[in-house]
Amino acid sequence: LGLDNEKDITINGLEAIKKSDVVYLENYTSILNCKNEDLENFYNKKIFLANRNLVEESNEILENSKTRNVAFLVAGDPLVATTHIDLFLRAKKEGIKCSVIHNASIVSAVGITGLQVYKFGKTTSIPLENENIETPYYVLKDNLSLGLHTLFLLDLNPDEEKFVSVNDAIRYLLKVEL
């Protein structure tokens, strides 16, 4: 899927969904600007929400993929998040045929800011639980020393309605610096 709503999809993506027996929507690394029902109505498919536990701990998706045509929907580019890469590699290891359909991602969408993509350094995440974590601050510091921008991916937990806001991220960076 793209970054916005049910219509923000490539033609290849739409065709893959139509051919699928089972459709999962990963709903914990990003949030779309539409409801699950909007997706189901637009694609005319039942869509099962895939939380962190289902994707990272359970084998349900892989087991279904062995005997059925499964679509695994994510907002943005499917191989930006490490959890998606892990699922892809586990499927390959089990001999499950996979195809990846790329779409717009936050990495390309950041161009709307006017900043040049080639001037970005390492990307980092600011987790919800960041009490003793300093890596994001040092990624920023290293990027700044090289004259590069930093893209921060802000953690979220939709099941608990918890999100790292921009203000939270700034407070975190200031706390680590001081």
Where are these regions (language model features)?
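A contiguous loop/helix-start segment that scaffolds small-molecule binding in enzyme catalytic cores
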Residues: 69, 145-178
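Class I SAM-dependent methyltransferase SAM-binding "motif I" and its flanking Rossmann-like core
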Residues: 76-150
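Class I S-adenosyl-L-methionine
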Residues: 1-97
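Predominant activation on well-ordered alpha-helical scaffold segments within soluble catalytic domains
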Residues: 62, 85, 107-108, 171-174
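Generic secondary-structure signature for well-ordered alpha-helical cores
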Residues: 22, 44, 115, 142-145, ...
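A generic structural motif
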Residues: 49-52, 103, 178
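Generic hydrophobic alpha-helical segments
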Residues: 13, 57-61, 136, 140, ...
